[in-house]
């Protein structure tokens, strides 16, 4: 499990702020990447838990949550205070933080059972701790210290793949050999840790699946070039979860090929799924703020601004057929390329996708992913 994916899932479920605060309470600065803070808190045993009354055992409902209650005719039911009543079925308990490591030390009994049950049921809060961490620094330097801390906290091995910054457009063979040697060593380390031998045929099949998914994904991204765009760049943000976590599966390839086919039909009909008239087109630079996507989408919608170019999304469309090609591809992550190539990529996507301007999200903890190099 990639800790960054887990952290993004926790953030998207709006638990990120609680987990970040827990990490800061552990001594981690709030200038550190939000993904890292969430992940480090999780490694320390912190879990988001539903608050309950110890006397009754019932969860304490947060009255601010829930959707408006509607009658049989679909009308909103108003309360005596003149405000809409809340549908009890949609209300959720107050949230608090608990520590799984402390819970596991408790003797078996009702308290232990209830505290375990109270931990948030979202899947990202139920993931077991890793047996080892495998780190690569081609997209993020913070990740090096982040994974080192996870390894220290969990007392587990750390396998490191170092990808030097590529200061030329071309990737030289010497650089590929350097990374390939690290992959070969990592394979041996993983064989020792897991007791399993590296299966070349399975790797080739995984590459074939990943390539199929990547090609379909890039085709989906390219449909944003049409005017009007058949969909919004915000849809790409939603689909990214699948291309990041399931790229090497047959199901992901099936899904994105089907999506590409559907978008092709939408373009032929001159239609769009964007729920507003497209007056302006912009490129989005930077990492989306996952729990606040609606807050960004709504004002853009109000002014007819559609995101029709994204730097972040196509970065997951790499194609390679063997370990050498994979090593070369690692040098082509947006944060690993030289400034000339980075500018050229952005100029090309702005031109091809016919944008009127650029919207830049300057993420203070992740400047390279905000288009800032140096």
What are these regions (language model features)?
Residues 180, 184-313, 318, 335:
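A charged, amphipathic alpha-helical module
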Residues 135-139, 284-289, 362-363:
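Structural motif
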Residues 2-26, 283-347, 351:
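Redox- and metal-dependent alpha/beta enzyme cores, enriched for Fe-S-associated oxidoreductases
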Residues 337, 341-374:
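C-terminal hydrophobic structural anchor segments
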């Amino acid at each position: 499990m990639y800790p960054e994916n887990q952290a993004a899932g926790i953030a998207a479920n709006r638990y990120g702020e609680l987990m970040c605060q827990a990490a800061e309470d552990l001594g981690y600065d709030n200038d550190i990447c939000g993904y890292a803070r969430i992940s480090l808190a999780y490694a320390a045993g912190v879990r988001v838990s539903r608050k309950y009354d110890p006397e009754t055992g019932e969860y304490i409902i947060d009255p601010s949550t829930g959707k408006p209650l509607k009658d049989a005719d679909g009308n909103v039911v108003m309360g005596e205070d003149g405000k809409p009543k809340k549908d009890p079925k949609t209300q959720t308990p107050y949230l608090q933080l608990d520590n799984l490591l402390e819970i596991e030390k408790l003797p078996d009994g009702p308290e232990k059972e209830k505290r375990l049950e109270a931990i948030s049921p979202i899947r990202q809060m139920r993931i077991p701790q890793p047996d080892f961490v495998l780190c690569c620094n081609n997209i993020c330097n913070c990740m090096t210290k982040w994974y080192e801390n996870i390894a220290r906290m969990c007392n587990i091995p750390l396998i490191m793949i170092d990808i030097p910054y590529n200061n030329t457009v071309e990737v030289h063979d010497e650089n590929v050999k350097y990374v390939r040697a690290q992959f070969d060593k990592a394979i041996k380390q993983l064989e020792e840790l897991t007791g399993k031998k590296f299966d070349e045929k399975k790797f080739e099949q995984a590459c074939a699946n990943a390539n199929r998914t990547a090609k379909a994904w890039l085709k989906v991204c390219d449909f944003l070039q049409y005017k009007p765009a058949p969909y919004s760049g915000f849809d790409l943000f939603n689909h990214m979860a699948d291309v990041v976590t399931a790229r090497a599966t047959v199901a992901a390839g099936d899904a994105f090929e089907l999506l590409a086919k559907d978008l092709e039909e939408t373009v032929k009909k001159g239609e769009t799924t964007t729920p507003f008239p497209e007056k302006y087109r912009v490129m989005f630079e930077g990492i989306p703020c996952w729990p606040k996507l609606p807050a960004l989408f709504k004002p853009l919608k109000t002014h007819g601004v559609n995101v029709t170019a994204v730097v972040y999304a196509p970065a997951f469309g790499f194609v390679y057929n063997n370990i050498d090609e994979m090593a070369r591809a690692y040098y082509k992550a947006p944060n690993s390329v030289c400034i000339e190539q980075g500018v050229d990529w952005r100029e090309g996507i702005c031109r091809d996708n016919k944008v009127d301007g650029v919207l830049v999200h300057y993420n203070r903890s992740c400047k390279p992913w905000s288009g800032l190099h140096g």
